[in-house]
Each structure stands twice: as structure tokens, then as C-alpha cells.
């Protein structure tokens, strides 16, 4: 994406393993899913994709601890539901539901959930946009 956009190329350099914002001395890179290799991070933003596939919350905890020195860190988790009710993602989903239902208040967490309504027919393709905008 960076290599084909003149606007992005002016500000960013894309390498094999990362993207660097030269004037900011910042970079974006992917990390291992092995939590033992992530200690010592000093990060401002962490994004976890498909959290339902994480067997433990080890990686998420290491990423959060790597943000403690930052004034306004941002931790973003994106996932589909998954099926494992023993996973940390299931616990997070329960918390998010409580926030969305007004049962729980948490100024540090923003929850957004896309899903069909209970009375929607999942076989009706016109309803799918609700769960996959």
C-alpha cells in the first residue's frame, strides 16, 4: 500500500518487516504470538486480531504492560466470536456485553459489536450487513 501511494511514500518507508514514519521516529511491525519473546516492549499502540484464537491472555497482558509508561496508550482488539467458552476472548465478550447493555460502566474500554438481531433470519442475505458492515 505504501509503495503505490505517493502521499504515503512521502511520510513512510515500508520494509520487509515493518513500516517506519521517519519524522516521528515511529514504526509499525508485527510481533510473535509467543509472549515470552515480547518482554521489554515500550509501545504506544497494540492491535490484536482474532483474539478468539488466543489460548491465554498472555500476549495481551504483555502488550498492556509494555504501555504502562505511555500517557495515552491505545490497545485495540478485533475478533470474531469463536466457540471456546474457556478463552480470554469469551470473558472479554461478556464484559463488552455488560458495557453495551449498560450493566457495567468502564471509561477505559470502548465496546462495539456487530451482530444480527435475535429475530433476524441468518439465511436472509439482506441481514448480513448488520454482522459484517
Language model feature labels by segment:
Residues 1-44:
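Inter-Walker segment of RecA-like/P-loop motor cores
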Residues 15, 57-133:
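Non-catalytic, compositionally simple segments
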Residues 6-8, 20-28, 54-57, 114-126:
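Phosphate-binding glycine-rich loops and adjacent basic patches that engage nucleotide phosphates
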Residues 49-53:
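Walker B catalytic acidic pair
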Residues 36, 54, 84:
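Glycine-rich nucleotide phosphate-binding loop and flanking beta-alpha elements
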Amino acid at each position: 500500500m505504501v509503495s503505490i501511494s505517493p502521499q504515503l511514500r512521502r511520510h513512510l518507508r515500508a520494509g520487509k518487516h515493518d513500516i517506519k514514519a521517519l519524522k516521528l521516529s515511529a514504526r509499525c511491525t508485527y510481533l510473535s504470538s509467543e509472549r515470552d519473546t515480547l518482554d521489554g516492549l515500550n509501545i504506544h499502540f497494540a492491535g490484536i486480531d482474532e483474539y478468539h484464537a488466543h489460548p491465554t491472555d498472555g500476549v495481551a497482558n504483555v502488550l498492556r504492560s509494555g504501555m504502562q509508561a505511555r500517557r495515552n496508550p491505545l490497545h485495540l482488539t478485533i475478533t470474531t466470536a469463536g466457540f471456546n467458552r474457556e478463552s480470554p476472548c469469551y470473558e472479554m465478550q461478556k464484559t463488552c456485553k455488560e458495557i453495551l447493555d449498560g450493566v457495567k460502566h468502564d471509561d477505559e474500554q470502548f465496546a462495539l459489536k456487530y451482530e444480527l438481531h435475535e429475530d433476524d433470519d441468518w439465511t436472509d442475505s439482506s441481514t448480513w450487513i448488520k454482522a459484517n458492515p
